[in-house]
Regions:
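N-terminal ligand-binding/catalytic initiation module
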Residues: 1-100, 290-300
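Gly/Ser/Thr-rich loops at beta-strand to alpha-helix junctions
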Residues: 26, 81-85, 111-115, 141-146, ...
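Conserved active-site and cofactor/substrate-binding residues in soluble primary-metabolism enzymes
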Residues: 50-54, 84-88, 114, 118, ...
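Glycine/charged-rich beta-loop-alpha catalytic/anionic-binding loops adjacent to active sites
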Residues: 98-106, 132, 252-254
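A glycine-rich, Thr/Ser-enriched phosphate-binding loop motif common to dinucleotide/cofactor-binding enzymes
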Residues: 106-124
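Glycine-rich phosphate/diphosphate-binding loop of Rossmann-like nucleotide-binding domains
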Residues: 125-205
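Rossmann-like adenosine-cofactor binding region
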Residues: 185-257
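Adenosine-phosphate binding glycine-rich loop
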Residues: 235-300
């Protein structure tokens, strides 16, 4: 009879690495899901159209299901098309945590944090490791990537100028950047490429964070005048005329140049490394500044 029911030793279930994807857009980003799996997540639990009011109960599902030593195997990734909503979701998640009932969390709505960080770290390295006192112009600097990049550069001591189509938007955003990151950020109008030369005059570093397929800075406006130029636009016509999409430290018109893919490849390294680190502890919060710390380690 015993031989008919052979003893089956108890096997401890594998503790899966679970990533809760809180996406403010109706359809959760497939891009973010794929990167999460490539970074080592075993399962991605995706929620779309997430609002502030949804966050607490979703977070409770993360923090009340595993014991203290296993809590690090659950993490949260906040994404979506709108960074301003993402920031609110991060705040709501942080408020739901208490004592050691928390899980590591990363904010990267629309890839804004990792893209901005990748650009800033590349710029810093190209300048010898220090941007303090450098005059840096961020064209289309009122968008999510531009504001994060400008903020990180200002925080590091750079003299930053952002451009905006509307002067009132530039003023409002520059004040918000200074409030969040500190430092000095000016704003100048730039409505069309014919105004670029005046808008970027006196700069040492040029970073374009403008919309896809819009050329903001003609070659004549920057050639021979800048030490570093970075264009985050990958769709022709590119944002800075004369910079190639694959540039990754190439020499262009006397400047060290980085194109969208030159920055994008490093952005992907940073993104994956950050996701991987979420599962090493249960109290990590990865926003612009802390993501930059990770990127600097990778750049060494």
């Amino acid at each position: 009879l015993l031989n008919a029911y052979p003893f089956q030793p108890y096997s401890v279930p594998v503790m899966l690495k679970l990533l809760l994807q809180l996406d403010s857009s109706r359809l959760p980003s497939v891009f973010d899901q794929v990167v999460a799996y490539d970074a080592g997540a075993d399962r991605v639990i995706s929620e779309g159209g997430v609002t502030e009011g949804d966050v607490r109960d979703l977070v409770y599902g993360c923090i009340f299901t595993r014991g203290p030593k296993d809590m690090k195997n659950t993490a949260i990734f906040i994404g979506g098309a709108d960074m301003s909503i993402g920031e609110k979701l991060l705040t709501a998640a942080s408020k739901a945590f208490f004592a050691n009932f928390r899980v590591s969390t990363m904010l990267d709505s629309n890839g804004s944090n990792t893209t901005a960080v990748a650009a800033v770290v590349k710029i810093t390295k190209a300048l010898g490791g220090n941007v303090k006192g450098r005059k840096i112009v961020v064209t289309a600097g009122t968008g999510p990537v531009g504001t994060r990049a400008a903020g990180l550069l200002a925080r590091a001591g750079a003299d930053v100028t952002i451009t905006s189509r509307k002067p009132e938007d530039g003023t409002r955003v520059s004040e918000a950047i200074c409030k969040r990151f500190g430092g000095t950020v000016h704003a100048v109008p730039l409505r069309e490429s014919s105004q670029a030369a005046a808008a970027i005059e006196g700069g040492e570093v040029l970073l374009n964070a403008g919309p896809a397929g819009v050329m903001l800075v003609p070659r004549a406006a920057w050639a021979g005048k800048f030490k570093v130029v970075v264009d985050l636009n990958a769709v022709p016509p590119l944002g800075i005329e004369g910079v190639e999409v694959n540039d990754d430290g190439a020499q262009r018109e006397g400047a060290i140049a980085f194109g969208a893919l030159g920055i994008g490849n490093f952005k992907m390294q940073v993104h994956k490394e950050c996701l991987s680190r979420l599962f090493t502890r249960n109290d990590l919060v990865l926003d612009a500044e802390t993501i930059e710390d990770v990127a600097k380690e990778l750049m060494k």
